[in-house]
Every structure is written in structure tokens, then in C-alpha cells.
């Protein structure tokens, strides 16, 4: 019950139970505190309690920063902090984490982290009405992931296609959104043939796509 794997498996479906187990795991010193705080952050984020999610991601980040032993985990926490800052409309703070994280992601050759941080910067710029900069970063994100055969990167690309389509439609850039819709449709067909893609996750992607697609058929 108090293992990292078990709690990581349940925090989405039962975040409150995960938090109870994490308290006990900390008391028992069942696994490293940086991971306990990461899972607390994820559990709170899953409940949309973003301030607490940020607080525990920050605690985990600081532990990594002090030890300097787990650069990959520190990068993961940097991504969380950039995204959570953006969600809370702290755009300058988000930019700080994202820009420092991109350098680390490139050093570690972590394309998933780099893509998440690039898109986060794009979202920040869009919300600050810096639209040209925003679409530049969205484009960089998609170019980084386009053509990847890695399942996680393909799923991430599908999500970013959908997210940018939403921004384009809000800005009445319908032709560009339509072009992305076609690209996403092709990607979803490829994902259907990847055996390790969870079917439930794929169906969610298709459902989101189908919610957007009818707009272009009106």
C-alpha cells in the first residue's frame, strides 16, 4: 500500500486516498521524500487544487536542487512548476521555470519535457496577447514532435494539435485550424495502429477531436 508504484497507480482515480497513503509513507520513510512530494503535487493537481500542487512540486524541486543527484527528476519538477505557474496566471514565474527547463531538457535530450515547456511559453504569450510569439512557440513544439515514433510523444503531439486548434479558432484563424485538424486526423489514424497506446486514452483523443471537427462542417 505504501509503495511508490501503488500510489502512482491510484492517484488519478482516488487522489484523496493517495494523499492519505503518502502521509503514512512519509512517516514510514517508505520511499524518498522528493517522490512523495511529487505524488502529492500530482494528487492535488488532479483535484484542481493548484496552489497546493505548486507548493509540493516546489518542495520536491528544492530537494532535487540541494542534492543535485537526480537531474531528470528535477527537470520533471521544473515542467510541473512552469505549467502550474501558468495555470495560476503567474506568467513571469512560469517563463522563468520554462526557459531554464528548456536548457536542461536539451542537455538531457528529453524531447517530451522540452515540448511541454515550449508549449507552456506559447500559452503564456498567448494569454499576454503576444500572439505572434505564441504561435511561434506552438510551431516549434509541433516541429519538435512531428514524425516521432515514440508513443508518448505522439500522444503529446495529438494533444498539442488540439490545443493549438482551440487557440486558432478563438483568434478566428479558421483555415489554419482546419489544416491542423487534418494533421491531427492523420496522427490519430497512426495511433490506432500502435499496440501500446491505451485504448481508453485514444478514445478520449478521438472524442476531443470529434468535438472540434464538426465546427468546420457547418
What are the roles of these predicted feature ranges?
Residues 1-218:
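A "functional boundary" signal
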